[in-house]
Amino acid sequence: MPSFDITSEVDEPSLRNSVDVANSKIAGRHDFKGTSANVELKEKLMTLYGDSDFQLDQMKAILLPEMTKKKVDVRCLEYGDVQKVSGNKVKQEVKVRVGVDQDLAKKIVKLLKDSKLKVQAAIQGDAVRVSGAKRDVLQEAIALVKKQITDFPLQFGNFRD
């Protein structure tokens, strides 16, 4: 029975590279000279440090296009609240979401069941396995999920016949 997996992955070297390039651009910009503006990446958590909310917005305006250039989907980012740090400094934590979380997986399974396509969907950890009788039905399922789920980057892989 043909099947495929729906996952959500982030290319970590590309993510680290885009953060490094953004940091070098921030260091070279005249309006950031003498400030504490920088971006840190630890595991799946980016932290933006700056002197004001405006600086954080400017840093995002540098970082997001760099991520797009490196083919890192910016929809995987989940922004936290801006926090005041010592003095007049601010920071913002940005989570890099990897894997299909349970709520999204349930939404995908419900979407496929309600569509009346002859496929079975099962949640397997941080992925959703979809299997069906024919390859054409699986392609319809992929098209349906791509059309309906647009707020989170999904990859379709591990095809088996």
Curated annotation (Swiss-Prot):
Keywords: Nucleotide-binding. Transmembrane segments: none annotated. Gene3D superfamilies: 3.30.70.860, YajQ-like, domain 2. Coiled coil: none annotated. GO terms for cellular component: cytosol. InterPro entries: DUF520, UPF0234-like_C, UPF0234_N, YajQ-like_sf. GO terms for molecular function: nucleotide binding. Nucleotide-binding protein. Belongs to the YajQ family. This is Nucleotide-binding protein azo2183. It comes from Azoarcus sp. (strain BH72).
